[in-house]
Amino acid sequence: MSEKLQKVLARAGHGSRREIESIIEAGRVSVDGKIATLGDRVEVTPGLKIRIDGHLISVKESAEQICRVLAYYKPEGELCTRNDPEGRPTVFDRLPKLRGARWIAVGRLDVNTCGLLLFTTDGELANRLMHPSREVEREYAVRVFGQVDESKLRDLSRGVQLEDGPAAFKTIKFSGGEGINQWYNVTLTEGRNREVRRLWEAVGVQVSRLIRVRYGDIPLPKGLPRGGWTELDLAQTNYLRGLVELPPETSSKVAVEKDRRRMKANQIRRAVKRHSQIAGGRRSGGRNNNG
């Protein structure tokens, strides 16, 4: 069965359909050696060769590809990029290896932010979840440094002007602390760059700690150590798909038994420790090379 080329490429995680349409129009995509044009349809077979900028890419039939989603506890210090030219650790380093697919990050967290980061094998799901029109809630626990009064909280709820347009927290709730070091839980329905930090800075308050604790109704899993991941079960995956009007999955790679749905904590901690040692050595080596 043939499908639109941009749909096949979006499913494989190479961008949204609109982004891929632009790539096709620019003549950057070839199918079996011929430059593709917008509107082309392809039938995914073992012999199909699709290239973007000359690089052969892997695609699968829709029926073959199971939508998988990971919840990852991103530590501070990791970059949301696949490869870093300086050799710094990235969020992709510790994810499980895949054959014939790849993990796609659902949004980004800046290098100094930790917490929940979702990954999926379904490019269309990732792009829809990230799109501002879907208004998927993101909740953050924020430790702030500075005087916070009712006037500032009111401004943050009603909206302040940032350099890229007006912004506001959907909800803001005090959650502990004393003096000028206080914790708040805030929610947003978009994912602009450093938006939480910039909102607080707009009212003269600095963020000293930032943790994403929820994406939609998916919380940061309890007991998951920093640098650890767990795969979402079928119900959670279909909840996310339903949020963005995608059809439900009918199968999952996650075992039914609860104790098999998550890597054991001690296994994850060993993996985290091992990765930290490797990353530490890599950074030391980088300093010596630059020094």
From Swiss-Prot:
Keywords: Isomerase, RNA-binding, rRNA processing
InterPro entries xref list: PsdUridine_synth_cat_dom_sf, PsdUridine_synth_RsuA/RluA, PsdUridine_synth_RsuA/RluB/E/F, PsdUridine_synth_RsuA/RluB_CS, RsuA_PseudoU_synthase, S4_RNA-bd, S4_RNA-bd_sf
Group of enzyme by EC: isomerase
Molecular function, one GO term: RNA binding
SMART domains, per the entry: S4
UniProt KW rRNA processing keyword: yes
Gene: rluB
Family: Belongs to the pseudouridine synthase RsuA family.
Gene Ontology process terms (BP): enzyme-directed rRNA pseudouridine synthesis
Domain S4 RNA-binding: 3-63
Keyword rRNA processing: yes
UniProt-listed Pfam families: PseudoU_synth_2, S4
Active-site feature positions: D110
Known catalytic reactions: uridine(2605) in 23S rRNA = pseudouridine(2605) in 23S rRNA
Organism, scientific name: Salmonella typhimurium (strain LT2 / SGSC1412 / ATCC 700720)
Free-text function comment from the UniProt entry: Responsible for synthesis of pseudouridine from uracil-2605 in 23S ribosomal RNA.
EC number: 5.4.99.22
Name recorded for this polypeptide: Ribosomal large subunit pseudouridine synthase B
